[in-house]
Structure formats: C-alpha cells, structure tokens
C-alpha cells in the first residue's frame, strides 16, 4: 500500500470546507477539523482524516445530526449533564469540556457528562483543553461494542479510552489510550493495507487468536462473534483481567453516570448514542501549583534520564512521541495511505468539491 504526504494547512482547510458543506458553523467546522488533524499530527492515523468517510456516511444516514444542539438536562455548581441529541461527537465534547473548565475556574472542580453523542475523535484533545488552562484534565468515552471480555468471544464493551493531561515542563504530560490492546481504527488501517495484523490483538468468531483484521471487523459489524482483546490480551497471566476491568470502569464513568446506552447497546437504534465524561481539576486546591508542576517536571525528566535497556537510546514519557510526531508532520506533511486518499476524494466528489484542486498530493519518500 502506497502512502502520500498532504500539506497540513491544505488538508485542514479541506476538512473545514467539508464540515461547512454538512451545515456546521464556522467554529464547529474549525473545531472538528482541528481534532481530526491533531490526531494525524500526533501520529494517530486511526483517529485522523481516515475517519472522515465514516463521519460522511454518518451524516448521510442520519446517525450524525449537524443541526443538533446539545441540551443541558441537569446541572449543579460542579456538574452538568448534556443530551447531545445525536450531534457530532466533537461538537458535544468541546461544549462539555468548556463547561467543566468554567466550573473548575469558579469552584476548583468541574465535571460534564454527555449521552446520545457520537464518536468524538482523539480523547487527549479534550484533556489538553484543561491542561492549557493550567488544570488537570481527564475524559472518558464508551463506543460501540468491539471488545470481548476475558475468556469471551462476544463483543460487550467498547475500546473505552482514558485520556489524562497535566501541565509540566518542557512539555505537558499527556496519556491517551484505549483499554483494548488497540483501537478499532488500527484494525481498519491493517485492513486497508491488506496486511496481517499482529497476533494477540483480536480473536475470531470462535474466540481464537487471528491476524485477519478485515475478518474481525466484518465479524464485529455482523455480530458473528469475536472482537478486539482488552489490554493484557487473552489471558489473566498477561493481565487481560486488568484491561477488562479498566474498560468496565470507563463504561461506568461514561454511559452509566450519563444515563446513556452501554457499549453493547450502542447503535442498536440506528442513532448516535455513545456517552462521554469530562473532568477539569484546578490542582491548586491542593497546594502550591508551581511546586507541583516542578515536581512532575522533575519526575518526568528523571524517567527520561533513567537507565536504558540494552539496545535502547531513549526513554519516552507520555506525550513525548506525539510532540516529536507533530513537529515532523508539520514540516513534511500528513501521511495518508492510498485507500484513505481515495475516500477523501469520494467525500469531496459527493459534496461538489474538487479535492485535488484544494490539496496538493505527493508520494511519500
């Protein structure tokens, strides 16, 4: 499978234009494009512009409603519950975290939960919204069921990611991971490439290890059995029960407290009905913020400077690889495979846009 490099600014403008065609206003279009490009810049191809075709289909089918306005259904000084009414997940998520941050500025802590939403992209984006306000940020989301429980072969939980961010120097601490071995998007990348995925990522309809990404995706879509494994793989000996438990905790912190559909019931009604939660904490409520920031910065540097394993020259802390990736891709362009490139052109064609007139395409070296 061939890869191409697309200029970040041109691809961003294209995504904003696409969102405008769907009926999103200027700020919404800018936010959605920023979240998509943030994923690609950070090296998270699975959550970047390759998602655009799925969003396009979601808008066409009515799963995503561009005209939906998230509604406050319950609120306290410290918390708020939003019904997204099948809005674009990014729109509801930005709204929710902005509300959580506003509450944290006033009271030291703010929480927002959302139900009846859609896929919201890369979770770290929202945690970093709080970090930029010199706060600790966290967010969680459930997804359509894609993960089998330990010893199971029926998908019951989503990829259910955890995102956490806190200010530090010279770069923030950012942790953003699925509670599955990999997110669905990673399987989609392998399926598009026609390559076998690593064993230990997923199981087939019989609960057996498989390297066939397309087969797993097809089985998930058709409810034929099999799915992605929780963090730790298939056995408690390698920690499978830990990933399974973390996925369940995220389910509680998203769908259960938001009053939404649990992962195994998401999308059964044909509407956007994922749930999310967002937390902002002014950590100054515990003491001297500058001292805490310095302490975290020192710890992170000590981790980087600690003894390396044989053959290794660098130890990374959470968020470092993303910073390195962003710098490289801003300079050299966003890498996009030929399958995703074809999908970007298809989206444009169906919306009356000439992709190649808007975005320069060059073969990756």
Task: Locate each region found by the language model.
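Acidic, glycine/proline-rich low-complexity segments that act as flexible tails and inter-domain linkers
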Residues: 1-8, 13-32, 37-38, 46-66, ...
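Residues forming anionic-ligand binding surfaces in small-molecule and nucleic-acid pockets
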Residues: 73-79, 83, 94-110, 210-231
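A generic, well-ordered mixed alpha/beta core segment in the N-terminal half of proteins
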Residues: 79-171, 177-178
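Active-site cofactor/substrate anionic-group-binding motifs, chiefly glycine-
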Residues: 47-101
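Phosphate/diphosphate-binding glycine-rich loops and adjacent basic-rich segments that engage nucleotide
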Residues: 147-221
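Catalytic-core signal marking the mid-to-C-terminal active-site face
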Residues: 2-14, 21, 252, 257, ...
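Secondary-shell segments that build the walls of catalytic and ion/ligand-binding clefts
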Residues: 196-265
